[in-house]
Amino acid sequence: MKLEVNLKQNPYDIIIEKGALKGVGQWVKSLWEPQKIALITDNHVRGLYAEKVKLSLENEGFEVVVFDFLEGEASKNLKTVNKAYEFLIKNGMTRSDGIVALGGGVVGDLAGFVASTYMRGIHFVQVPTSLTAQVDSSIGGKTGVNTPFAKNIVGTFAQPDGVLIDPNVLKTLGKRELIEGMGEVVKYGLIDDPELWQLLDNIDGSVHSILENSETIIYRSCNVKRKIVVEDEFEGGVRMYLNFGHTIGHAVEQTAGYGKVMHGEAVAIGMVQISRVAEKKKLMPQGITRQIAEMCVKFGLPVDYEPWRVEELYTALTHDKKARGNSIKTVIVPEIGKAAINQIPLIEMKEYLEK
């Protein structure tokens, strides 16, 4: 399966194919001339796939060096970025060389940020290995790192030269790691794809059913994001729809401590809680919050967070990129498969969260 991200300046393809990882070297060679490549990954994925990917690249004439860091959201910071810069400099990486991001969302976000800022930008590709990365973070060109004050507050827009997705690698994920990716999948069904929502409604929510339907789930999710990114690359309008659940979700991730609540879990919590707020304000139809919550629970996703530290969440919301003065732009779902943007006063958000 192939999806074309037809951007005006940096078009690229998303390849979705079981077993595709075996041919990663040939795929990269179809994009770049043989050169030096920095393979950026985390310590967990390195043990699973890095040597296979390195060998595949070397067999196509690339010189490969490997940089890894401790897995997890807690590593997605400027300290790790500086270590990566130092590694690239010591290994003589130039602007004619490239980066292969091999891993989940943390790896992709960090490697993309490094690629877009090292020497003012070098080429990179995404080879995502988690469901969250395959359906969401590897596509669209958003890169970034966290600070103690806010998630993804430091970042760039930088498109990869390509995305290679092998659904087979999902089999090596732990149950929690696989299920958290369904938070983003549920989001796509809600904001733009009622057929995807129907598919999710029809399957039983087990790990087996997710893996059995993985190609369709990934393809439909990627297609939603592809369409939206092509229409609005730099988040001036409809791309904000992709943030459904993320406003409160990011605040939950930050206040819990990065890594304690996984990203997809936080998105599920965020979708349910913002829907609860919007339903009370009569911005969403009665009963839709229950539908969203039931879908999330079916897949084993959380819909609430305890302890619900409202003061800390409120502070995090005021630092959100979507905050404007005393209000914050939020995404709501007036009906399944349709999204809209609404401005909610921050003080109202706090009052609703307290209830």
UniProtKB/Swiss-Prot annotation:
Subcellular location: Cytoplasm
Lineage: Bacteria, Bacillati, Bacillota, Bacilli, Lactobacillales
Chief location bin: cytoplasm
Gene field: aroB
Full protein name: 3-dehydroquinate synthase
Cofactor(s) needed: Co(2+); Zn(2+); NAD(+)
Organism in which the protein naturally occurs: Streptococcus thermophilus (strain ATCC BAA-250 / LMG 18311)
Protein family membership: Belongs to the sugar phosphate cyclases superfamily. Dehydroquinate synthase family.
Binding site for NAD(+): 71-76, 105-109, 129-130, 142, 151
CDD domains: DHQS
One Pfam family of this chain: DHQS_C
